[in-house]
Swiss-Prot record:
GO molecular function: proton-transporting ATP synthase activity, rotational mechanism; proton-transporting ATPase activity, rotational mechanism
Name of this protein: ATP synthase subunit b 2
Highest rank taxon of the organism: Bacteria
Function of the molecule: F(1)F(0) ATP synthase produces ATP from ADP in the presence of a proton or sodium gradient. F-type ATPases consist of two structural domains, F(1) containing the extramembraneous catalytic core and F(0) containing the membrane proton channel, linked together by a central stalk and a peripheral stalk. During catalysis, ATP synthesis in the catalytic domain of F(1) is coupled via a rotary mechanism of the central stalk subunits to proton translocation. Component of the F(0) channel, it forms part of the peripheral stalk, linking F(1) to F(0).
Chief subcellular location: membrane
InterPro entries documented for this protein: Alt_ATP_synth_F0_bsu, ATP_synth_b/b'su_bac/chlpt, ATP_synthase_B_chain
Bilayer-spanning residue ranges: 2-22
Keywords (A to Z) from UniProt: ATP synthesis, CF(0), Hydrogen ion transport, Ion transport, Membrane, Thylakoid, Transmembrane, Transmembrane helix, Transport
Family listed: Belongs to the ATPase B chain family.
Any one of the GO CC terms: proton-transporting ATP synthase complex
HAMAP family, sorted: ATP_synth_b_bprime (MF_01398)
Localization per record: Cellular thylakoid membrane
Length: 244
């Protein structure tokens, strides 16, 4: 059997040409298309992963912001509650202080009114005692109450302590107004002379600058004043001394 080398070579050449043509016009485009498709898929996959990661980050960020907002909300609520409590406490304290001040003012007003009432009451009682005592003494001893008060005051002057004499002398040295003698009633000229004579005999005051005045507050009483120092005897002081 003879081998036709020409035919074999021609077929080999045709095969190679066919392989080249197939590779050039069929396989390479297909492979290129497949690779391009794979690259596209890979790119889409990577994009999807990126979007997934981004979405996850956004979700985490949103969750974090939500948590921060919740914490801020709680903080604001706590602050608001604290301020509300402080405001309530302040209002309660202001109300308490206002009530306390009003109560104190009311108590002080009540005390003043009570003191004024008792002062007026005592004043009226003293006046009644003054009138009644004057009538009683006048009826029983044939002497007026005024005269008895003068006698009692002269006795008081005659028995001054050394300290009282010293204080009176010091006060007389600090004033040019002399002495002032006040009484609830008008002192008669005769009683005035008795008082002046007593002042000279007891060496309390040798001058003649003595003023006689009336004072309705001296219930059943009489007082001697030199500058800011005074010596007094009256029923009102006597009663107050008994109260103390």
């Amino acid at each position: 059997m003879l081998i036709d080398w020409f035919t074999i070579v021609a077929q080999i050449i045709n095969f190679l040409i066919l392989v080249f043509l197939l590779n050039r016009f069929l396989y390479k485009p297909i492979v290129k298309t497949i690779k391009a498709r794979q690259q596209e898929i890979e790119n889409r996959w990577q994009d999807a992963e990126k979007e997934k990661k981004s979405a996850k980050n956004e979700a985490n960020s949103y969750q974090k912001k939500q948590q921060e907002l919740e914490e801020k909300k709680q903080e604001i609520m706590i602050q608001a509650q604290t301020k509300a409590d402080e405001k309530y406490d302040n209002l309660v304290e202001e109300a308490r202080q206002d009530v306390e001040q009003k109560r104190k003012t009311w108590d002080e007003s009540l005390e003043r009114e009570k003191a004024q009432f008792f002062d007026r009451f005592q004043e009226k009682i003293m006046q009644q005692i003054y009138k009644i005592t004057g009538h009683v003494l006048g009826d029983l001893a044939n002497a007026s109450l005024e005269q008895q008060i003068i006698n009692q005051f002269i006795h008081r002057l005659e028995n001054l302590s050394e300290k009282e004499r010293e204080n009176l002398a010091n006060s007389l040295n600090t004033t040019d107004n002399g002495l002032i003698i006040r009484s609830h009633f008008e002192i008669s000229p005769e009683s005035r002379n008795r008082l002046l004579s007593s002042l000279q005999q007891t060496h309390i005051y040798q001058g003649d600058n003595v003023q006689f005045m009336t004072n309705s507050d001296l219930i059943c009483g009489i007082e001697l004043q030199a500058s800011d120092y005074k010596i007094a005897w009256n029923l009102k002081d006597y009663v107050e001394a008994l109260e103390i």
